[in-house]
Amino acid sequence: MATGTPDSQARFGQSVKGLLTEKVNTCGTDVIALTKQVLKGSRSSELLGQAARNMVLQEDAILHSEDSLRKMAIITTHLQYQQEAIQKNVEQSPDLQDQLSHLLK
């Protein structure tokens, strides 16, 4: 810098010091904002991971429920066959009782 009065050099130094202070404050604010954004992104990632885990658990529960429903349908079919067989036996019962009483006479 060219020679100048000590007063102008002091003002220039103060001006530079003020600009540096402003830049440092701006950088500090930017770092804080960036840190908040990173933390928010990190939390979003955690929430997304938890949502994925919950979805897998729900999918497993749905598959288990479907399997249970298939088994229940098979059991229902078997019970219907048994009910039909019992119904036929009940319908034939009076005929058998009549035959038995006729034989015992």
Curated annotation (Swiss-Prot):
Transmembrane segments: none annotated. One of its GO terms (cellular component) is cytoplasmic side of lysosomal membrane. Pfam families: BORCS7. InterPro entries: BORCS7. It is found in: Lysosome membrane. Keywords: Lysosome, Membrane. It comes from the Eukaryota. GO terms for biological process: axon development; lysosome localization; motor behavior; neuromuscular process; organelle transport along microtubule; regulation of endosome size; regulation of lysosome size; response to cycloheximide. The keyword Ion transport does not apply. As part of the BORC complex may play a role in lysosomes movement and localization at the cell periphery. Associated with the cytosolic face of lysosomes, the BORC complex may recruit ARL8B and couple lysosomes to microtubule plus-end-directed kinesin motor. Belongs to the BORCS7 family. Component of the BLOC-one-related complex (BORC) which is composed of BLOC1S1, BLOC1S2, BORCS5, BORCS6, BORCS7, BORCS8, KXD1 and SNAPIN. This is BLOC-1-related complex subunit 7. It comes from Mus musculus (Mouse).
